[in-house]
Structure formats: structure tokens, C-alpha cells
A protein has these predicted regions:
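Residues that define the transmembrane beta-barrel architecture of outer-membrane proteins
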Residues: 40-42, 74-78, 124-130, 137-139, ...
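Outer-membrane beta-barrel "beta-signal"
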Residues: 134-143, 163-191
């Protein structure tokens, strides 16, 4: 579902909501790979690397020491975004955006703990990110660049100095553009 609000000739608000549920039937245990859902990346949650979010509270990076091939898939998808688009100069356009969403599993998976969908907790597992983008609109194609960072991760993060208080929380107090470590761990550039 997409909806656009034209504020005036040069400014608009674009919204999008994407949902999906898939279920393997017959003698299949899992949906075909191509039919499974993923979130994260340039056409999804832009503050997270491609296909890196979820399912649920599962955190691939906490268990694996590689970011070479993160490919998280799920049976349920909920994703939305809102973007304020504006003209900067002729073919150059800008956008400020907020993206939110996650994927979940229908069945428990021992290899991906925390991935099963539950009505009483799914809203706590929604990842949220924000950022700024530039668009170069040449009529016959659009070249797009986005820089984004997470405001809320889908998994609990440590909020204490001693490393023992894992909680779902907003990350406003952690934002520090002057820290090279924060930039390395949080800024995501999409093209």
C-alpha cells in the first residue's frame, strides 16, 4: 500500500505499508527461499544492512563474527515508512525518512531463538531507523543515495554500564556522530 500527499508543487510526503504472511503446506517444512520475506537494505529498512533484521529478536551478529553474508528470512513481514520529499535544485531532490519493521517466523526455530511471532510482544520487536537521502532525477532514471542510522533495534540492547541490563529501548542517547565507533556500527549508506 502506497499513498502520496502533495503538500505543494515542490514538496510531498510519501508513505508505504508492506505486510505479508506465508505458510508452507503439504509435505514442505519451509516456504521456498524466493517466497520468504526479509527486511533491511536500500528498498526496505535503510538504517540496517540488507536482509539483516530479524526474525523477531534474533540477532545474527551477536552469534556470528562475520557480516559477509547476513541473510535473515521469515514467514511474516510488517514494514512501513514515511518520507518527506523536496526539491533542492532542478534535478536534485532530497528526502528525510523514517522506516520501521521486522520479520517473524510462524514456527519455533532452535537455530534462530526469539524469531517466532507473538501478538503480545511483536510491537517491541519493531526496528526503527531514520536518515536523509539525495535523488538525482534525470527523467529516464533516478540515482538515489541514502545515509541512515537506527533509532531502535529489533533485539534487546545493553543499557547499563556493567553489561547486564538487556532491554528494548530507543537509541537516542547513543547517537554520537563524532565517535568513529558509533559511525562504524550504525551509519548505513545505501545507493
Amino acid at each position: 500500500f502506497r499513498y502520496y500527499f502533495d503538500l505543494n508543487k515542490r514538496n510531498k510526503i510519501a508513505t508505504r505499508l508492506t505486510t505479508g504472511v506465508g505458510y508452507a503446506y503439504g509435505n514442505s517444512q519451509f516456504m521456498p527461499y524466493i517466497k520468504q520475506f526479509s527486511v533491511g537494505g536500500s528498498n526496505s529498512l535503510r538504517a540496517f544492512p540488507a536482509r539483516s533484521v530479524g526474525p523477531g529478536t534474533y540477532n545474527f551478529l551477536a552469534i556470528n563474527d562475520t557480516t559477509f553474508f547476513i541473510d535473515q528470512r521469515g514467514d511474516i513481514k510488517l514494514e512501513g515508512n514515511i518520507e518527506y520529499r523536496f526539491d533542492i535544485y532542478k534535478a536534485v531532490k532530497g528526502g528525510l525518512f523514517v522506516d520501521a519493521g521486522n520479520i517473524w517466523l510462524i514456527k519455533n526455530d532452535t537455530l534462530r531463538p526469539g524469531g517466532k511471532f507473538a501478538f503480545n510482544s511483536f510491537y517491541k520487536q519493531v526496528a526503527v531507523g531514520t536518515g536523509f537521502g539525495l535523488r538525482f532525477d534525470f527523467s529516464f532514471f533516478v540515482l538515489r543515495f541514502d545515509l541512515a542510522f537506527p533509532l531502535r533495534k529489533a533485539y534487546p540492547v545493553d543499557g547499563s554500564e556493567d553489561g547486564t541490563n538487556n532491554e528494548f529501548r530507543w537509541a537516542f542517547r547513543d547517537i554520537d556522530f563524532t565517535s568513529k565507533y558509533w559511525r562504524r556500527d550504525n551509519l548505513v549508506f545505501n545507493r
